[in-house]
A protein has these predicted regions:
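N-terminal glycine-rich FAD/FM-binding segment characteristic of electron-transfer flavoproteins
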Residues: 1-340
Length: 340
């Protein structure tokens, strides 16, 4: 009762990386609250396959739901598993990835339990809250932090009265790590039929296709990112050339993607991917909160911008004050001369 829960996604018998990231964060939240970390995973043929991918992240108790029809994911059975289990266990916090599955499952579960959900959080913390209207004081609430109003401010959202406090987080926002402390590491295997009625399985997935990623933006050690200041699709061609020389990948701000200069799967930020490269070169990017949320944990940040007051310069380690179309060709020329 009153524990922290994480819903773990699987692709076949492989646990999603975002789930392991949330387990790491969930363990920290559970420690702060003095409660246990519990995890849920549902699929087909996963018993004996997923435990070693989940328990090492500090899980006290893992609920493994294994039955035909639970993979590939469909809405009804997974919703009933979580809703009925949460009614029994009464968690204080429930987390899941802000993925295609999480965006479908999270609202269904929170609506069924009349709790509430904050999507696409960039940080999760524990803190107190004073309700000025009622005069009530709440301790140990989940601070659900995310950009709001088009990314112009950062909002901290709390859910004082309803449980569980639910949040989704994008892949790459949190960092995963094996837990070195003490925890129970217990796995249980509930009977699926007690949680899921037979009619939930009326939908059958006939074909399941997973498309391979076109690039490794999230895993790249060097990212060259362009914003609206790059000026054109041709300008991005130069960024691709620079990234190739540096053995890196190209990313972009939302403004550049909306302009049609680069594909959406390269968008970095709150509505794109989160990256943690060793070096992040921001070219013509102003640095709205929404974008910074997706790259602020980079090792070294280099800003190329003709505006000395651009917000991104405040978090940059190095600033090159100049036009992208002047600076980038010089960088390319330099690296070509010195990489031979």
């Amino acid at each position: 009762m009153n524990n922290v829960f994480v819903y773990c996604e699987v692709e076949g018998t492989t646990v999603a990386e975002v789930s392991q990231e949330l387990l790491t964060k969930g363990r920290k939240l559970a420690n702060q609250q003095g409660v246990e970390l519990h995890a849920i995973v549902a699929g087909t043929g996963i018993k004996g396959q997923v435990e070693d991918q989940i328990l090492p992240y500090g899980v006290d108790k893992l609920f493994v739901f294994d039955a035909e029809g639970l993979f590939p994911y469909t809405s009804a059975p997974h919703t009933d598993i979580l809703v009925n289990l949460f009614k029994e266990e009464k968690p204080q916090i429930a987390l899941m990835g802000a993925t295609v599955i999480g965006r479908d499952l999270g609202p269904r579960v929170s609506s069924s339990l009349t709790s509430g959900l904050t999507a696409d959080c960039t940080e999760l913390e524990i803190g107190d809250y004073d309700d000025k209207k009622s005069g009530k004081h709440y301790e140990g609430l989940l601070y659900q932090i995310r950009p709001a109003f088009g990314g112009n401010i950062v909002a901290t959202i709390v859910n004082p009265e309803h449980r569980p406090q639910m949040a989704t987080v994008r892949s790459g926002v949190m960092q995963k790590s094996i837990y070195e402390g003490e925890c129970k590491k217990e796995a249980v295997y509930p009977e699926v039929s007690k949680y899921v009625p037979a009619e939930d399985f009326v939908v059958k997935v006939l074909d399941h296709h997973v498309e391979a990623a076109k690039h490794n933006l999230k895993g790249s050690a060097i990212v060259v990112a362009g914003g609206y200041g790059v000026g054109s699709k041709e300008g991005f061609d130069q960024l691709f050339e620079l990234a190739h020389l540096l053995h890196g990948e190209v990313g972009a701000s939302r403004a550049a993607v909306d302009a049609g200069w680069v594909d959406h799967d390269r968008q970095i930020g709150q509505t794109g991917v989160t990256v943690h490269p060793k070096v992040y070169i921001a070219c013509g990017i102003s640095g709205q909160i929404q974008h910074i949320a997706g790259m602020q944990d980079s090792g070294i940040i280099i800003s190329v911008n003709n505006d000395p007051d651009a917000p991104i310069n405040k978090i940059a380690d190095y600033v090159i004050n100049g036009n992208v179309e002047d600076v980038v060709p010089k960088l390319i020329k330099y690296y070509k001369q010195n990489s031979k």
